[in-house]
């Protein structure tokens, strides 16, 4: 029986552990340099665009043009170290076309903690803006919330669900944040992402169908059409 004598000469084990330690240190240095010189480590903003593209391909049926446009827009925005304006995505479509699912995937693959990230802000009209009579109060609160959170983290995501149910005029307070200016209210907002979700029926009623034509709805959109607009 052959007896290994490694117990008498532990240098191999020590050198192996030293190699692991050096490799870990090198990996840490690379990550540190990336955080120092890149914009990927702001807050918990860690974009995983290949993972997003994979999940969209595997779990979102149809919507080929929409998927391609989402990925293309995000790549261009994330890779730009100094964007001139925030990324604005408008997702609209019929019920069941994947609007909410796409928005959750975006948060999941853009931030380390996904929708639980303190820098992902999800607004629901039923929860946050239930009383149209308080629109002016909501405007002040929304402006203060967006401004304060962008001051804390420029890489913030603001998700507005069911846009068709929001009090009229509420979104006017966001217009200064969506343009190409450098600073708004003393806040640099150009790295922010805004996502607006709207039901297609509301879009049709607000701008598609002539007034007074009840029931004049468009045919259901084909799966290949992209219910998405970017700014």
Swiss-Prot record:
The keyword Repressor does not apply. Residues 28-189 form a propeptide. It is found in: Secreted. Salusin may be a endocrine and/or paracrine factor able to increase intracellular calcium concentrations and induce cell mitogenesis. Salusin may also be a potent hypotensive peptide. The gene is Tor2a. Belongs to the ClpA/ClpB family. Torsin subfamily. ATP binds at residues 93-100. Residues 1-27 form the signal peptide. Keywords: ATP-binding, Cleavage on pair of basic residues, Glycoprotein, Hormone, Nucleotide-binding, Secreted, Signal. The keyword ATP-binding applies. GO terms for molecular function: ATP binding; ATP hydrolysis activity; hormone activity; identical protein binding. PANTHER family: TORSIN, TORSIN-2A. GO terms for cellular component: endoplasmic reticulum lumen; extracellular region. SUPFAM superfamilies: P-loop containing nucleoside triphosphate hydrolases. Residues 192-211 are annotated as: Partial activation of MRGPRA1. Glycans are attached at residue 149. This is Prosalusin. Transmembrane segments: none annotated.
């Amino acid at each position: 029986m052959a007896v290994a004598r490694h117990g008498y000469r532990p240098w191999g084990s020590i050198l192996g552990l030293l190699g692991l330690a050096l490799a870990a240190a090198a990996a840490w240095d690379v990550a540190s340099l990336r955080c120092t010189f890149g914009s990927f480590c702001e807050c918990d903003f860690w974009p995983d665009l290949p993972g997003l593209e994979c999940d969209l391909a595997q779990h979102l049926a149809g919507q080929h043009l929409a998927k391609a446009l989402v990925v293309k827009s995000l790549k261009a925005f994330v890779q730009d170290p100094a964007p001139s304006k925030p990324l604005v995505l408008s997702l609209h479509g019929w019920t069941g076309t994947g609007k909410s699912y796409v928005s959750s995937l975006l948060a999941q693959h853009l931030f380390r903690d996904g929708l639980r990230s303190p820098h992902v802000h999800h607004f629901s009209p039923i929860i946050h803006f239930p009383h149209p009579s308080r629109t002016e109060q909501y405007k002040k609160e929304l402006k203060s919330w967006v401004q304060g959170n962008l001051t804390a983290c420029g890489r913030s995501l603001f998700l507005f669900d069911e846009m068709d149910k929001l009090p009229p005029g509420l979104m006017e307070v966001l217009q200064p944040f969506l343009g190409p200016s450098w600073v708004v209210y003393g806040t640099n907002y150009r790295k922010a992402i805004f996502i607006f979700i709207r039901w297609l029926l509301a879009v049709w009623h607000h701008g598609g169908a002539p007034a007074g034509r009840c029931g004049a709805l468009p045919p259901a959109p084909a799966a290949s059409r992209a219910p998405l607009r970017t700014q």
